[in-house]
Amino acid sequence: MKKLIIIFLLILPAFISAQGKFGSIKVGIFSPVATNTGFILGYEGGKNIDEVLSIGFSIDWFNKNYIDQHLVNEFNDFYGPNSSLNELRAKTNLHAIPIMATVTASWPVADRMRVFATGGLGLEALLIWYRNYDNPDNNEFKAAFDFAWRLGSGINYEIGSRSDGFMELAYHYSQPSWQYEVKDGVTGKSKVFERKFDMSGLMMRVGFRFFF
């Protein structure tokens, strides 16, 4: 399934002809369950099918440095409480990059103003730098992937003949994960931990769309 999504996302831009194309830059905030609220930056390209529908693709980037409290609790429960050290072990630097195919419908509600509803399906890649359990001053790297979907709506305002400004509110869903084994050098106890990153949450963004 993931391979089919990747192939579809790669060939989608080739089907979008030059006529009626647009590009959008989006900035805002994203509040996934796994991390605290942070800044998110995105680009969406696409083509207008008619006066209502458009299709396209989007790519976003979200970065957060945080302490995984769920992992801290697991370390405390299994290896014994050592809050300060386990918090260091649970420090995580996460980069989320969802790539999605999108469909948007919009309708006029006033002069130069339209409301829109949008949806997307695709794949989310997480690039994760996390601390080594035995040597928490050292970073290790892992990539995780999962299916992603998004639903949203907003308001579009026509600035000029080839430019719009817009605001949108969307809900994003994805839960990439992976498993790894940790062995405590003092107790000799081993455990397989699952790092699940619940990237589901609300995002609020503003942006500009340019037609060419």
Where are these regions (language model features)?
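Predominantly the C-terminal beta-signal and adjacent terminal strand-loop region
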Residues: 67-68, 151-212
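Surface-exposed strand-loop-strand hairpins of Gram-negative outer-membrane beta-barrel proteins
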Residues: 29-44, 70, 144
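Flexible, solvent-exposed coil segments and beta strand-coil junctions
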Residues: 19-26, 77-85, 128-136, 184-188
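Residues that define the transmembrane beta-barrel architecture of outer-membrane proteins
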Residues: 19-21, 37-41, 93-99, 143-149, ...
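Outer-membrane beta-barrel translocator domains and adjoining extracellular loop/strand segments
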Residues: 36-40, 67-74, 127-136, 178-186
